[in-house]
Amino acid sequence: MTSFPHPSTSESGPDPDSEPNREEQAHAYCLRLLTARARTRAELAGKLTQRGYDEPVVARVLDRLVDVGLVDDEDFAEQWVRSRHLYAGKGKRALAAELRRKGVDDEVISSSLADIDAGAERDRAERLVRDRLRREKLDDEPGSDLKVKRRLAGMLARRGYSQSMALDVVTVELAGERERRRV
């Protein structure tokens, strides 16, 4: 039976705080974050800085991730807009605000929002109002329409639709729903 000597404490491995090792740790951390969902360069930079990584290490790691295509703010913005507009019913203003919070450049934001035309935005607003109106109790009391209009216009405003579009859509859809219920 052969025995191996115990590793010497004086011959320790690489210093865990050395620059190359810190860079690899930061890279591994970014990869773990990216497995959950796509992230912007600014989001990853914020997470790394929060963890205490130095600016040069952060820049090198993010440059590596951009070079291999794992971080792409333009692609992120396009996917975000498509997903949040379709599934969450967000309007252009709300989407732009969300992307700004995630650190996406204004130029990239405007190009990704260009895919949503006014007709598609209005169609989505109409569907949202129609769905909500089906569950809404509509009274014949005076002033009840005003309450419903305010509630629905507020819902659309919180989702980032313009006030003029919200009021127009709510007025048209409310009239249509009243007509549908009369028949």
Swiss-Prot record:
GO terms for cellular component: cytoplasm. Pfam families: RecX_HTH1, RecX_HTH2. It is found in: Cytoplasm. Residues 1-12 have a biased composition (Polar residues). One of its GO terms (biological process) is regulation of DNA repair. Keywords: Cytoplasm. Residues 1-26 are annotated as: Disordered. NCBIfam families: PRK00117.3-1. Modulates RecA activity. Belongs to the RecX family. This is Regulatory protein RecX. The gene is recX.
